[in-house]
Amino acid sequence: MNKTPVPISFAEKFDCFTEQWSPKVVAEMNDYQFKLVRLEGDFVWHDHQDTDETFIVLEGTLLIDFQDGTVELEAGQMLVVPKGVPHRPRASAEAKVL
């Protein structure tokens, strides 16, 4: 059995689906899952009581609304939303996010 890790191509993985707001698991490590997602339009206001949430923008622009303002993320930027903090991600055009 080969134990050499194989690189994961984000482009190839994104080519496998077109659905919006439907994260796809592309890798797992310990207790973590790495998910790719296509985002366009507005999501609902929500929070995560048990875990932080990370957004890494690979392509496009992602806006994340908070109760006291909005953060704009461009390709190559990352944001960690602390657990329990209400937020709403949105994108006026498709953004590809890890």
Where in this protein do the model-derived segments appear?
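A cytosolic small-molecule/anion-sensing beta-strand core signal
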Residues: 30, 58-59, 74-75, 93
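Conserved short histidine dyad/triad with adjacent acidic residue
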Residues: 19-20, 33-49
